[in-house]
């Protein structure tokens, strides 16, 4: 028994002795990797664990996972496309709406006011120039009267008189034409009124807008009240209690000859 135990312990010690020489081999490796780490470079990571067996592509679970990943990738791609399209549309809208900024509106308003003021000023200048031209045309240029002789003054006065005479004649002709046109317009208006009939607008009074509505409602209520449409019957055949007239007793009427006796008594009295 003791010999058997020794034989079993001897082979177990051999592997332990074989494992001891591996320690010095690990030391140089550690010494060789420590120097690069001291020079500022990180030590390489430990070797990864050995990968498991490769997955079978024909496995239904693997196929389902791949299909799920592909579907998720397609959904993400479509979402990205929609997001990009919406961003582009919003940018386009902002670019269109944001063209007339408050500053641009203010500048445009100032330019329009400036242009309107310039146009108004030009129109006033044009009217003033036209007025001066008409005055010069009708009245003529002023004459130098300080150095003029008596004969020249008379000629100037006669010229002004003739000009005034012509202007008055033209004025009278124009007024006559205006009166004539006014008369023709009034005559035509009278003819038009005669043809279509002159309509005089009557004086309107204020009426409540709810009055007609209330009348319609009352009319509808009366239509639905069927008792109002029934005829009144004066016969008392269908009354529950018939009222009997009070009859006088026979003794109060008296005998048939009592009336004649009463008349004779009254005649004698």
Curated annotation (Swiss-Prot):
Q: Which residues carry this modification: N-acetylalanine?
A: 2
Which residues are annotated with the PTM N6,N6,N6-trimethyllysine? 201, 205
Regions of compositional bias (Low complexity) in chain numbering: 9-50
Region described as Troponin T-interaction: 162-171
Q: Which UniProt keywords apply?
A: Acetylation, Actin-binding, Methylation, Muscle protein
Q: Which GO terms describe its molecular function?
A: actin binding
Region annotation (Actin-binding) maps to 189-202
GO CC terms of this entry: striated muscle thin filament; troponin complex
Tell me yes or no: is Acetylation among this UniProt entry's keywords: yes
**Tissue expression profile of the protein:** All isoforms are expressed in somatic muscle. Isoforms containing exon 6a1 (isoforms 1 and 2) are expressed in all muscles but highest expression is in abdominal muscle and splanchnic muscle of the gut. Isoforms containing exon 6b1 (isoforms 5, 6, 9 and 10) are highly expressed in the tergal depressor of trochanter (TDT) muscle.
Positions of region (Disordered):
1-104, 239-269
SUPFAM superfamilies (UniProt xref):
Troponin coil-coiled subunits (SSF90250)
Q: Which GO terms describe its biological process?
A: adult somatic muscle development; cardiac muscle tissue development; heart contraction; heart development; muscle cell cellular homeostasis; muscle contraction; muscle organ development; myofibril assembly
Compositional bias, Basic and acidic residues, is annotated for 56-91
- According to the lineage, what is the superkingdom? Eukaryota
Q: What does this protein do?
A: Troponin I is the ATPase inhibitory subunit of troponin in the thin filament regulatory complex. Involved in the development and maintenance of muscle and nervous system. May also be involved in the cytoskeletal apparatus.
Q: How does it assemble?
A: Binds to actin and tropomyosin.
**Recorded family membership:** Belongs to the troponin I family.
Q: What is this protein called?
A: Troponin I
Q: Which organism is it from?
A: Drosophila melanogaster
């Amino acid at each position: 028994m003791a010999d058997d135990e020794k034989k079993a312990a001897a082979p177990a010690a051999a592997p332990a002795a074989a494992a001891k020489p591996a320690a010095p081999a690990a030391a140089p490796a550690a010494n060789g990797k420590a120097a690069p780490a001291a020079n500022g470079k990180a030590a390489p990571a430990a070797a990864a664990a050995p990968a498991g067996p490769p997955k079978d592509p024909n496995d239904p679970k693997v196929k389902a996972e791949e299909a799920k990943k592909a579907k998720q990738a397609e959904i993400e791609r479509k979402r990205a496309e929609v997001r990009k399209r919406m961003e582009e549309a919003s940018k386009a809208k902002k670019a269109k709406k944001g063209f007339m900024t408050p500053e641009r509106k203010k500048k445009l308003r100032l330019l329009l006011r400036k242009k309107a003021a310039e146009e108004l000023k030009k129109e006033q200048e044009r009217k003033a120039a036209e007025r001066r031209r008409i005055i010069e045309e009708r009245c003529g240029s002023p004459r130098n009267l300080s150095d003029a002789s008596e004969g020249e003054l008379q000629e100037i006065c006669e010229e002004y008189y003739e000009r005034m005479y012509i202007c008055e004649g033209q004025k009278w002709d124009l007024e006559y034409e205006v009166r004539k046109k006014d008369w023709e317009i009034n005559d035509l208006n009278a003819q038009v009124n005669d043809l279509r009939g002159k309509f005089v607008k009557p004086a309107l009074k204020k009426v409540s807008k709810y009055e007609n509505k209330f009348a319609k409602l009352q009319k509808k209520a009366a239509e639905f009240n069927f008792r109002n449409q029934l005829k009144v019957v004066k016969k008392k055949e269908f009354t529950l209690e018939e009222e009997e007239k009070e009859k006088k007793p026979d003794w109060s009427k008296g005998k048939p000859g009592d009336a004649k006796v009463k008349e004779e008594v009254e005649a004698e009295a």
